[in-house]
Amino acid sequence: YGGMWRQALESFDVMFVQNEESKKLLATLGFDNVLVAGDTRFDRVAEIARAARRIDVIDRFKGDNRLFVAGSTWEPDEELLIRLINDNPDVKFVVAPHEMDESRIARLMAETKGGALRYTQCTPRTTYGSRQLLILDTVGILASVYGYATWSYIGGGFCVGIHNTLEAATFGLPVAFGPNYEKFKEARDLVTLGAARSVTDYEQLRTWFVPLRDNEEFLQKTSRIAKDYTTRHQGATGIIVKTIFH
């Protein structure tokens, strides 16, 4: 099996890798036609952010309030988020479940003291008032919704592993997620830089959120770190295209 893959690698004129570690690994196998280009996902999320669209339902739900967006959540994430929602009545929340499980959606709606709505049930005549939670029970718009947010939470960290942190970070959002994140380099980097926090329980989530809620200077500093990180790592696509067509 290993020999088969090595033979396949020998057919390439140039191999593009994301980091120096990968280049060094290939060097130990005798390959010197390796170029560190970076991660094209940074270019992709930047493109998505530039193409983010206005969404009438989100505009009307958010109003003049600050918004917390939790994307791709699983049930253990939602257990923490319900407590955070109820402890912060002056903040609006959007929760986008990873799977549209009706029992979980019903629980979110029932346990949110400030009132909840489902995105798919909103119409031009919907009155949002003080409703605190909007459940994003649809697909294809989460990346644009991050553009409305002040803070973010990425689900999956209590289960198979966290989902895409870059979609939130590219908007300059502080990010929190569960403990299963170590295999994702960008998540490790964001934690090291202070733009993200891994939490294992509600108290850790609350401790992360409150300073970002109450200290505008700290919030802006953290946001800049997240945004600068994603900006700094853009450009891989251009390197690859330029090399191929040189």
Predicted regions, residues:
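Nucleotide-activated sugar donor-binding and catalytic core shared by glycosyltransferases
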Residues: 1-246
